[in-house]
């Protein structure tokens, strides 16, 4: 229900959101409205549909009758998830990382690119105005070597999801080793 509230906030502030995208990305406002801003509701609606079909506790052996006690697999939140997003198509990356993490019951710390923080600031406002409890979605701004490195090494962060350069992805992977974090990387770009 709270994540649906983010969609309500998006719908109320669509023009403002598209203008922020246009300013950050240098995209024409029509393109921001038609192609970039719709990423948030599209991904969110799809995650909400998928969420309804997740079997959070399921039998280890689904062929066994369910009327008898048996071992089960329980899906549980990982905990605190660090989300590091790139400068390009930032709203797409925020939606792909933050929405499923919150639906799974995780708390998030989002560090957007220092070159495109406006989308993340608006998303944080959407979360606040939608009634997401304090501490569930957190926003930190700053550069990769400073803030990104802190997220990657912090002992309370259980997982890092990073999209960006191969060089930075390597650094994040190495930094996360000491705390045995789960790491997901989408790499490309400039080295």
Where are these regions (language model features)?
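Conserved NAD(P)+-binding/catalytic subdomain of aldehyde/semialdehyde dehydrogenases
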Residues: 80, 129-191
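Short linear capping/connector segments at secondary-structure termini
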Residues: 20-30, 34, 59-66
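Short secondary-structure junction/hinge motifs that connect adjacent elements
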Residues: 1-6, 62
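Long amphipathic alpha-helix in the N-terminal Rossmann-like dinucleotide-binding domain
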Residues: 4-15, 29-55, 67-69
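Conserved small-residue-rich beta-alpha loop and adjacent elements
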Residues: 58-135, 158
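Alpha-helical structural signal in soluble globular domains
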Residues: 5, 9, 20, 41-48, ...
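Short alpha-helical
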Residues: 12, 16, 27, 39, ...
């Amino acid at each position: 229900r709270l994540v649906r509230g983010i969609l309500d906030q998006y719908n109320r502030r669509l023009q403002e959101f598209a203008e922020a995208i246009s300013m950050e990305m240098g995209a024409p406002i029509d393109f921001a409205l038609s192609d970039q801003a719709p990423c948030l509701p599209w991904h969110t609606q799809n995650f909400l549909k998928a969420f309804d079909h997740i079997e959070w506790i399921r039998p280890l052996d689904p062929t066994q009758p369910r009327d008898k006690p048996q071992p089960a697999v329980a899906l549980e939140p990982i905990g605190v998830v660090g989300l590091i997003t790139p400068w390009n198509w930032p709203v797409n990356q925020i939606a792909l990382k933050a929405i499923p993490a919150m639906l799974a019951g995780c708390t998030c710390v989002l560090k957007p690119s220092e070159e495109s923080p406006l989308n993340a600031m608006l998303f944080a406002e959407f979360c606040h105005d939608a009634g997401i409890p304090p501490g569930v979605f957190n926003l930190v701004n700053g550069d990769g070597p400073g803030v990104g490195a802190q997220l990657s090494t912090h002992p309370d962060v259980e997982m890092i999801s990073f999209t960006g350069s191969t060089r930075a992805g390597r650094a994040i992977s190495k930094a996360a080793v000491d705390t045995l974090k789960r790491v997901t990387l989408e790499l490309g770009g400039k080295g």
